[in-house]
Amino acid sequence: MDQSKMRYTNQFRKTPQKPTSTEVGNHHTPAHSPMAQHETSMWNFNSLNPYFSMLNMNDGMNYARHQQNHIVTSRPPTPLTDLMSLRSFQSFPNVFMPVSRSRTSSFIQSDTDSSRLEPDDFSQNVRYCSTEIDRNNSSSKNDHLKYSRPALSRNSRSFTRSNNVLPTWSLDSNGEMRSRLSLSEVLDSGDLMKFAVDKTGCQFLEKAVKGSLTSYQKFQLFEQVIGRKDDFLKLSTNIFGNYFVQEIIGMSLTTYDDDNIKRQEKLKNFISSQMTDMCLDKFACRVIQSSLQNMDLSLACKLVQALPRDARLIAICVDQNANHVIQKVVAVIPLKNWEFIVDFVATPEHLRQICFDKYGCRVVQTIIEKLTADSINVDLTSAAQHLRERALQRLMTSVTNRCQELATNEYANYIIQHIVSNDDLAVYRECIIEKCLMRNLLSLSQEKFASHVVEKAFLHAPMELLAEMMDEIFDGYMPHPGTGKDALDIMMFHQFGNYVVQCMLTICCDAVSGRRQTKEGSYDHANSFQVWLKKLHSRVTKERHRLSRFSSGKKMIETLAHLRSTHPIYGLQSSGHESFKTDCFSTASEHDGLELEKNGIEEGNLRLMRTFSP
């Protein structure tokens, strides 16, 4: 039977639709005509929701009088088959073809696996339906019946379920787990796997193993969970079973008997044989992390050596789940056992792929944080410190060589921000500022992501480099020959550059008000901050009408007004200039606002000529 002749009722339909309409579900067929030769059709009412009662059943009966039509229902009964017992349905006994499937009701939600229609059930249904159709319609022997998998309801949790169900002996007459079920019964029955992959069963097991257990019960648990590789891998990759596996691993590693090391060896071998696949699995990656955390250190180090050294390691670093395995390795394993990861990441072609990824950038940042934190670890030997310094230098050299490309990336910019903000990485911070940012401040300030890096550089740069950066913004670029706009003008009204100007203004205000240290060594740079503040004040005063139209401009005005009110001794208050009163900016004309919008588009693309040679 052609698929085009199948009719499917629409799930969650709230408006009545007649069976003879031209649209049923997603299939379009011409409306029924008494004059035309009727074709064999099939209706599938198995996925109906309570709104099915709104169907016009009289029209349905008129359509069903054609003996070549078939209405497919379920057994056990659905509400439609309940209606079949009515008097109006009794004249159509051959029309309705019950299709068996393992489900109690189309409407009743269930936490058991019986609420899911599996591929095997579909194949059985198709064979049964094909037999019945051929029996009643010999002309349709060459037709093919195809089923599409019904969509899961909003509240359905069957997509998280295993194919297994709890054994019948563990259930009461209501289909619920017996209240007096014991762990010993489960272990002796050999059905532990079925419990571990079921939500209710797994909760029962987790609660049971936290109680007092005999030595024999522990032995049974270890054998049935981590004793066989196939069972271990199946549970590790299961949404519920992985939690139970983690419980048993923790119990196994803290049970100090004669078989403790043997169990750990077996566990290490199981994971090593499927290391990449388990790392990439949403649930098994948690089992690996738990093993690394609790396993004997020597065996955990051997487990790390099972990580690949090829493109698969990139896949692990950038995977949503597997990246946490790398971070766990970095956190709990000595550097000498994962130094190969640093070398792999520091390779230029690998660094770009990993840093440009949402999860990979976090892996690189975690490595940098670990290598930096260990610099003050007094427990490390001199050899370990030397190894740490070499690894950090290799990674930082690779990062600084690509710092401008990384600074403009959506994710990699966080790595550069972290380096610039960390005082323990001051050497590499200065290298990034000199090599990447200087002579590019105007262009980078207009980049969405690089502007954050420029802000961090202004906040954390040493005085010598800060002075060079300030001078570059104020005097480092020639004004545009056509508009006369300089770098500060462009940045003040740019959607990203204005944040850099706000940062510059905040730095100067904090220094003048005493909230920022102005001494570096034996020299006090307070005068430099006052000079920079006067330049910013002058420009904000000049552009106050335009700035008052935007929230960023209002913040600059408010910052200077607050400084004047709290610290009137910084050198600008004597003029009594009204620009520091925020209420005076409300008189700006509408023309100024329109002119700002017009100029903003042009200024956004400007790149002024540098007054210095690179």
From Swiss-Prot:
GO cellular component: cytoplasm; germ cell nucleus; nucleus; perinuclear region of cytoplasm
Keywords: Cytoplasm, Developmental protein, Differentiation, Repeat, RNA-binding, Sexual differentiation
Magnesium is among the record's keywords: no
Sequence intervals crossing the membrane: none
Pfam families, A to Z: PUF (PF00806)
Top-level division of the source organism's lineage: Eukaryota
GO molecular function: mRNA 3'-UTR binding
Gene3D superfamilies noted in UniProt: Leucine-rich Repeat Variant
Feature: compositional bias, Polar residues: 1-24
Record domain PUM-HD: where: 160-564
NADP among keywords: no
Ranges of the Pumilio repeats in the UniProt entry: 185-223, 224-263, 269-305, 306-342, 343-382, 398-434, 436-471, 483-519
Main location: cytoplasm
Protein location: Cytoplasm
Tissue specificity as recorded in UniProt: Expressed specifically in the germline (at protein level).
Stretches the record annotates as Binding to gld-3 isoform A: 283-614
Function noted in UniProt: RNA-binding protein that binds to the consensus sequence 5'-UGUGCCAUA-3' in mRNA 3'-UTRs. Involved in the control of stem cells and sex determination in the C.elegans hermaphrodite germline. May also play a role in the hermaphrodite germline proliferation and oogenesis. Binds specifically to the regulatory region of fem-3 3'-UTR and mediates the sperm/oocyte switch. Negatively regulates gld-3 expression, possibly by directly binding to two sites within the 3'-UTR of gld-3 isoform b.
PANTHER family hit by this protein: FEM-3 MRNA-BINDING FACTOR 1-RELATED (PTHR12537:SF112), RNA BINDING PROTEIN PUMILIO-RELATED (PTHR12537)
Extra remark beyond the main annotation: Fbf-1 and fbf-2 are >90% identical on both nucleotide and protein sequence level. Experimental approaches often do not distinguish between the two genes, which are collectively referred to as fbf and are considered to be functionally redundant.
Name this polypeptide is given: Fem-3 mRNA-binding factor 1
Organism whose genome encodes this protein: Caenorhabditis elegans
